[in-house]
Amino acid sequence: MKHQEYLMLAVFLSPIYLLFQAYILLWLYAWADSCSPALHSLFFRIPVTVLYLFFAVSPLTGFLITKEPLHHFLRVISNYWLGTLEYILLFIITFDVIRRVTGHSFFMKYRYPAMLHTMPKNLVIFGGFVISLILMVSIYGVLHARRVYVRQDPVVIEKSSSLPGLKIALIADLHLGYNSTKSHVRKIVDTINSQNVDLVCIAGDLFDNDYDAIKDPDKVADILSDIKSRYGTYACWGNHDVSEKILAGFTFPQKETIVRDGRFTEFLHHAGITMLEDETVCINNAFYL
């Protein structure tokens, strides 16, 4: 998709995004009011709304504010927010659809906000269940992303070679940037080294469009340089390995030609990773990569 098409799509989706935020807030108000009449006051709604909007607009503020460390903080918050928002919408919309189409809900006949004050207390239970579900799934998602999984897949290639076989570690989509940490990179390196592989291949998207998003890049490169294998570590570029401004996953037209930040290449050299750019290499006179 071209940059102009991304821009048009972003402009089209912006009001839809705002409507979704209003929809979520209305249900949050309804649930709070069902919990206690005291929560119907502005003393509750104003701070809750301000806090919610802080998260809701964090993709935009993180995009516009470039001064560190606030920029980095907002980008981290916005990334977590966008991931959590998917589950918020999924569960609330599912709950609302079931409420409207089944005739068996205790509060089926109620419509927010016109009948807000007549909503029964059962909304406390159902709303609490939905909120708990959102929190559990979101927390699981964060913890799941921090784990390193190893999957072993035997692959047979019908070609002659002087080698009886190769044990290759294939990793991809490191997305080194706002939400990556040195400890996580270290965990990946330690996991690779524990497998005693012959070759390490990195299948693109080492970076996340912004070299400056990496905290302490020299240290991260040092950690990656600790990868151990018989024939070395090789990589190829991915679509995120270019310098490009992104807002909530959308790229925007730029006056200058999009180029790859030279620091990406320097980083890989520092990390001992060989980048293959539309090329093959003969390794140890035994096989081609």
Where do the language-model regions lie?
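Non-catalytic terminal accessory segments
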Residues: 1-146
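Soluble catalytic domains of enzymes that build or remodel membrane lipids, polysaccharides, and related
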Residues: 151, 156-289
